[in-house]
Amino acid sequence: MTAARNLIAVEPTSRPEMHLAMASAVEEGGGTIVPISEASGLMFADPMAADSFPDLIAQATNVEWVQLPYAGVETFVQHLDASYTWTCGKGVYAPPVAEWIMTALLAAFRDIPTFARAKSWPAQAGRNLLGARLAILGGGGITESFLSLIKPWDCDTTVVRRQAAHVVGATRTVTTDQLDDVLGRVDAVIIALALTSQTRGIIDARRLQAMRNDAWLLNVGRGGHVVTDDLVNALRNNDIAGAVLDVTDPEPLPDGHPLWTLDNCLITPHVGNTPAMGLPLIADR
């Protein structure tokens, strides 16, 4: 017998804060929380517990729909099964991540990494974000949200994506095969891509060399988009102005890693979206 569509399991319970937020959202939306053996849908409530999915779904007899908590689904790829309808958090976290990009850009252009580490009064440095030339890799919700935030700065924005369909708010949209031509013309390269076999290592030594030596690299996508050793070399040699990274490869970045030692590298610990920011957004969605 098929279960009623409003019977939803919220599992696992390993992250109580996320479990509570998602369970409350189900109930506010008119759903009923039930054990997975009785459910027609599963709200998966711990993005770090993908390995528990097979044992969990084995208890289900009527589940037709699985909702994943984050936009990134790479840890679940091996578990995807066409017999279920899958949805994820794509687009839900775009506003806070776009806000991180704005923060990172202003920090980079105003040379905050240098000033934050200074032990004595440093020389004046910095430049204006107003009118800057920016390349954004990826044309999804994060990029759209960022473009709305950056609009008052009157920047020249080039979105690089697989498809040529124009992204609203961008000065222009080009396809990935034009990336090499774009890199040498911009003041900052912003990575906001999903990680796939095609995008892994998209920024390597050759493409870092193609960037201007006064350009910044920002990564809010996944650490695997950048070849880390190549980035370390580029930063050491001042081939680019610097990097601001919210994601790294490996992640967490180990103590003593060369990236921690570089004055032109600013690292944040994957806080483009935090639980405090994201849980209300996904619960509302």
Language-model-derived ranges and their functions:
Residues 17-18, 87-97, 114-118, 251-285:
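C-terminal helix-to-coil terminal segments
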